[in-house]
Amino acid sequence: MRVILLGPPGAGKGTQAKLISEKFSIPHISTGDIFRANIKEKTPLGIEAKRYMDNGQLVPDEVTIGIVKDRLTKDDCDNGFLLDGFPRTVAQAEALDEFLKGINKELDVALLIKVPEEFILERMTGRRVCTSCGASYHIRFNPPKIEGKCDICDNELIQRKDDTEATVKERLEVYSKQTYPLINYYKDNGIISEVNGTESIDEVFGNISNILGRDK
């Protein structure tokens, strides 16, 4: 089972990726994680990626693709994998497809978790975190007993900069520009499947399991 996971920020991809990985016994490959691992281990590609990042530049596709390719050739990917955070563009998707075709491991499913923008805004802008113990809350879905105060240590709750409305809208705009062409690419290839990400975690995972079960 070889899967690409797509969806906007705040769609719950991380939660679902963990559940998919456990149920179907395939590694969850997050591009952020493998970048950090390559940089930490000082691999040739990691050193090159760090050089661009230290200069405030985007890491070129050939470096990113090289890091992903290297990870996909590991033994734990023999029976499948779940890719999260890559590809981000059609050019990256084409390069990935060419590589996978060459090793007879073509993608089975591009799984899209669909969530309306207004739902994501409510979900992300409502998040609050304790300045002291790090406990997480949500002003609507998981509110503290006393507004603005942590239930555990009574310290102040704050909204992280990443969760402000302006930041969330900016991230959604970037996602739309990058990912809509990618969604159409996988639609044209006939491998995209969509699930409603506004349902509960269990309901979303149940729908995902049905899709992946069909494609096994």
Curated annotation (Swiss-Prot):
Pfam families noted in UniProt: ADK, ADK_lid
Localization annotation: Cytoplasm
GO biological process: AMP salvage
Cellular component terms per the entry's GO annotation: cytoplasm
Annotated binding of AMP, by residue: 31, 36, 57-59, 85-88, 92, 160, 171
EC identifiers of the protein: 2.7.4.3
Pathway assignment: Purine metabolism; AMP biosynthesis via salvage pathway; AMP from ADP: step 1/1
GO molecular function, one term: zinc ion binding
Binding site for ATP: 10-15, 127, 136-137, 199
Listed HAMAP family: Adenylate_kinase_Adk (MF_00235)
Family according to the record: Belongs to the adenylate kinase family.
Domain comment, as recorded: Consists of three domains, a large central CORE domain and two small peripheral domains, NMPbind and LID, which undergo movements during catalysis. The LID domain closes over the site of phosphoryl transfer upon ATP binding. Assembling and dissambling the active center during each catalytic cycle provides an effective means to prevent ATP hydrolysis. Some bacteria have evolved a zinc-coordinating structure that stabilizes the LID domain.
Assembly, per entry: Monomer.
Protein name (Swiss-Prot/TrEMBL): Adenylate kinase
High-level lineage: Bacteria, Bacillati, Bacillota, Clostridia, Eubacteriales
UniProt gene name: adk
